[in-house]
Each structure stands twice: as C-alpha cells, then as structure tokens.
Amino acid sequence: MEPFLRKRLTFLSFFWDKIWPADESEEDIPRIQGHDDNPVPEQAAAVEPCSFPAPRARLFRALYDFTARCAEELSVSRGDRLYALKEEGDYIFAQRLSGPPSTGLVPVTYLAKATPEPPSDQPWYFSGISRAQAQQLLLSPANAPGAFLIRPSESSIGGYSLSVRAQAKVCHYRICMAPSGSLYLQEGQLFPSLDALLAYYKTNWKLIQNPLLQPCIPQIPLVQDEWERPRSEFVLRRKLGEGFFGEVWEGLWLGSIPVAVKVIKSADMKLADLTKEIEALKSLRHERLIRLHAICSLGEPVYIVTELMGKGNLQVYLGSSEGKALSLPHLLGFACQVAEGMSYLEERRVVHRDLAARNVLVGDDLTCKVADFGLARLLKDDVYSPSSGSKIPVKWTAPEAANYRVFSQKSDVWSFGILLYEVFTYGQCPYEGMTNHETLQQISRGYRLPRPAVCPAEVYVLMVECWKGSPEERPTFAILREKLNAINRRLHLGLT
C-alpha cells in the first residue's frame, strides 16, 4: 500500500511521511514538509563539493523559476545549472553549480538534463592561450599576486590547468578529470564543475599555498603585432656564444619564460630598416624556423628575442662529446631538417645570407631550426663586406656574394653545401688552415672541399652541385630537400 500511494499521490508526501516515518538510514536526506507543518528545521549535513562524483548524465538545468516552500527545498532560477546528488521520487536532491554553493530538493518537472558547457562566459577562463602566454598575462602590471585563470591544458586534451600569480612567479596546477567526469587538483577532492572547484580552493587556498583573489585581467599587450618590448622585461643569465651579429644569451622573459636573446650593437645596424625587416620576418612561420618573440630596438644595445633551444647551435653541439657520438642517420636527419626550413624560405623568396651550422639551433629532442634568417640585411654595408675582414663569413659565402655582394637564394644554396660539410665532419671548420683571401683564391681556381670520411657518396654529389661556379647551375632547396629525404629513406631501409 505505502509504495503505491507514494508513487501515485506524490503531492501528499508530507501526509505519508506522518503515517509512515522515514527509516533512520534515510535521515541524511531531508524530506519535504507540508505548508501547514511547522517543524523545527533540521540542519542538513553540509555537502562538500568534493564529496560526490560528477557523472555527466547528472547535470541539470532549471526550466522555470522555483521558490522553496520550506527549508529542505532549494530555490532556483530559470537557467541555473544543478548537479543531482540523489533522486527522491518526483524530486531531486541537487547542488546548485552557479552562485553560492547550496543544496536542496527541486521538483523534477522544473528540470531538464543538461550537457556540460565550456566555461567561456567566466572571467577567469581563458581559451586558446598557452602556458607561456598565461605567465605573461599574470605577470603583467595589470595583475597582482592572487590573480588566477583557468586555461585548456597543453599536455592533456580536453583537460584544464589553473595558473596563479604568486609574487614574481606563476604557479601552474593541472586539473585532472576522473573517469566519472569529476574534476580534481588533489586525489580524493572531487568536484562536479570548475565553478565548484574554484569556490572550494578560494576558501581552502592553503591547500595549494596560493590564494585565489581575483580573475586575471586580460589587458596585457599580447597582440602579435606588438613586437617592441621594454628591455626591462628581459634578464640575461648566461652567454651562449658570439657571432657576426653580436652576442647570444640565455635569458628570462618576465622572470619565468626561457628565451634566447641576441644582443646587437646599434653601431652595426641599419636601425631605420629594422622595423620593416622585423615586419617581414614575423610573418615567417615554419616548424624548422626559430620563432621570433620580441625585439628591443629603443636605445642600445638592440635585443632580438627568440625561442630557446636546449642544445644550442649545431656547430658547437656536433663538436661536443654527445654530438660526436651521433651516427650517420642522425647527421642525415639534421641535413634534411635544415633543407626543409630553407625550402620554406625559398618559397617565400627570403634570402638568409648567413646560413651556417652556427645559425642552426638544436632542441633537446634533436630537432633543428634555422635562425638569423634575413638579419644580415640589417648590417651596414661597411660592416658586412670583404674589406671589413672578419665580419663577413667568407668561408660560408658564395663567391659572387663575397666579392660583389650579390646575394640570392642560390648563394644560400652554396652556403648549404658548406653546412653539409660541417655536419658530416662533426662541426669542423671549412677550409681549415686557409685565410679568407686564400679561400676565395682557391675557390676561383676550382678547388672544392673534399668528401668527409663519414659522408655518403650521394650526399657529397649534392655538396658539389651546391658549389657550382654559376649560380644558375646550383639546385634549388626544393630539389635538395627531396633528394636528401630520398637518401634518408634508403638509409633507413638499409638499416632495417
């Protein structure tokens, strides 16, 4: 009788409760009291957001406004998102996900199942930004310690990360997702939504040792066109080397972002052309080219800021103990990667002018990226000329460029042939023992560098083609890329 009446006449549930009191095992869930009753309201056990799993099927949205008629009910407004904790006949005991955390009973007829929505309307959610960009945002003058944001995770597809400013640094926390769909920072602390997670850690911030005070203010100049940055944003930490354009340093941007900083003396630069040249360079994007981050051209010295590659330049790396242990497939892989980058520059009609192993950078995973493309054009004519002696890299430069300053994609091809020689000699200097003058003299007489001991014969054939006296007879980078890739494939097939 009881189950039948409770199911058919749910609107008299308060009356059935008087006739058939609830079992003690169910006292933790408040039941509806009638309008005429005046019970002493029970204090429902506080529902911690972390105490319940959050399967996606238990998310609801309020279809209509509902005003609670007693302490056990929960008032909701149309559009409110709720998480169902337990079904109670024609009611759902739910937790409201928007606004102050609260729980109570809501009639099922007032609700509809909802699907999780990306929190794009929240001021603390930043979509489409990376970890490095989050650091820039939070460390900007507009944001103080305690500023925070949530962003999509870079390492976990569909996941999130919490980034919080703590004085002069930014702390990042991965927000994990349990199989049930719950979110957590710490195991055992489960939350049905990002709102609930933030609400909990705003109160219990000591668990992550950083208070969550206010959402990040998105007014940092992170627009891609704003390349000019104040020099004060960069700290030079360790000198990595020195080349024709100045010194290269490992540095930190905004106190936490590792970067490479090329320091150039203004006396050697055509500063009037710098902005125009940077405008051209920043449009070049390829996985085999170093990414340009920023420039500092106001005052002296000029900074050109790029991404940092862990193993430094290719010439130095090849001469290291780790580099000397590399096998032929690795060396050929370097050649193929550089050819890919140069082929892209060729398609964009960009002339490098200073292609050499010292201007190719190596990552921790042995990826190669071409650097300093186009910068030689910024050097003053009296600096980058044969008469200036050591400033011009004669041993890497095509004869027509070294003698007459005729630079082209085909003069880059000549330099690529010299780079191949460096790769297959593990960083050895070309024309060793010769002066610049002697080098040019010998080249004009037909001398070409010999085949390195570990260099495959078919690769050396490509080197010699790169060193044709007539630029028109030299291959394009597109052809070099295809031929090197073909040699690489045959080598790997032979090894397997």
Swiss-Prot record:
**What does the record give as the active site?**
D354 (proton acceptor)
What the entry lists under InterPro entries is as follows:
Kinase-like_dom_sf, Non-receptor_tyrosine_kinases, Prot_kinase_dom, Protein_kinase_ATP_BS, Ser-Thr/Tyr_kinase_cat_dom, SH2, SH2_dom_sf, SH3-like_dom_sf
Give every SH2 domain span: 124-216
Assigned keywords, A-Z? ATP-binding, Cytoplasm, Kinase, Nucleotide-binding, Phosphoprotein, SH2 domain, SH3 domain, Transferase, Tyrosine-protein kinase
Location in the cell: Cytoplasm
In which domain of life is the source organism classified?
Eukaryota
Q: In which tissues is it expressed?
A: Higher expression in liver, lung, thymus and skin than in brain, kidney, heart and spleen. In skin, highly expressed in keratinocytes. Abundant in lung, liver, spleen, kidney and testis and is also detected in the cerebrum.
* Disulfide cross-links: none
In the record's own words, the domains note is: The N-terminal region regulates its kinase activity.
Give a short account of what the protein does: Non-receptor tyrosine-protein kinase which phosphorylates DOK1 on tyrosine residues. Also phosphorylates KHDRBS1/SAM68 and VIM on tyrosine residues. Phosphorylation of KHDRBS1 is EGF-dependent. Phosphorylates OTUB1, promoting deubiquitination of RPTOR.
What is the protein's name according to its record? Tyrosine-protein kinase Srms
| Organism, scientific name | Mus musculus
Gene symbol here is Srms
